[in-house]
């Protein structure tokens, strides 16, 4: 739902058979405009909240600054790059919803809007020194959808769990690195052990021939 609180908004769209060739929103107003996009999964609740743009922007800026403040300090030469990296990580965090049982970090919110079953390890390492809870969730998130065989899905999102491929088993290495900085509890260590055991056994049972491990596809 696109709700125009101030100004005007006009939809310009051209349809061909079952889909649109393009969709354009022409927005404007004599004194500016303010429109909101509200995601609706089933039925509209008939609620149109009033938003103050400056206040919403301030809350978002405060959330970003709080995230950055907990990241490790960098030398002056690297601060601009570190700020951009922190912003990209922060902006890719999404709330639990649908198939996502915990907070997750997508690869981006541009077009790689998934969590892939090895990229998430690098996300966990990136957050381990400033955001231990997010780092733990990022490292263990694939366990939420681990198959009974031990296999991990190729990727997950709020809407999909995809099994087309598998990814390199770097999760044990990642856990070892995380243990250097994260104060993992006995319960977390037990959860990680069960996860890694099933994952390792899957490789030994289903991806080994003549003593060598193999991939079925280049995307693996």
Predicted segments, located by residue:
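Acidic/polar, glycine-enriched structural segments that form the non-catalytic walls/loops
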Residues: 1-113, 186, 193-205
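Substrate-binding groove/exosite segments of carbohydrate-active enzymes
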Residues: 68-176, 180-181, 189, 197, ...
């Amino acid at each position: 739902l696109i709700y125009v609180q101030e100004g005007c908004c006009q939809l310009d769209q051209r349809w061909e058979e079952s889909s649109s060739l393009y969709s354009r929103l022409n927005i404007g107003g004599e004194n500016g405009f303010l429109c909101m996009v509200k995601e609706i999964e089933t039925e509209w609740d008939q609620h149109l909240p009033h938003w103050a743009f400056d206040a919403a922007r301030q809350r978002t800026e405060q959330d970003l600054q709080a995230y950055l403040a907990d990241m490790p300090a960098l030398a002056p030469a690297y601060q601009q790059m570190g700020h951009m990296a922190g912003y990209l990580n922060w902006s890719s965090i999404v709330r639990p919803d649908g198939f996502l049982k915990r907070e997750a970090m997508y690869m981006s919110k541009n077009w790689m809007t998934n969590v892939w079953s090895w990229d998430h390890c690098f996300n966990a390492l990136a957050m381990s020194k400033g955001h231990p809870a997010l780092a733990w969730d990022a490292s263990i998130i694939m366990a939420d959808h681990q198959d009974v065989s031990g296999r991990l899905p190729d990727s997950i999102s709020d809407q999909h769990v995809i099994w087309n491929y598998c990814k390199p088993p770097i999760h044990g290495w990642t856990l070892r690195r995380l243990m250097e900085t994260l104060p993992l509890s006995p319960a977390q260590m037990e959860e990680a052990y069960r996860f890694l055991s099933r994952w390792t056994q899957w490789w030994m049972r289903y991806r080994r021939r003549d003593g060598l491990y193999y991939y079925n596809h280049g995307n693996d």
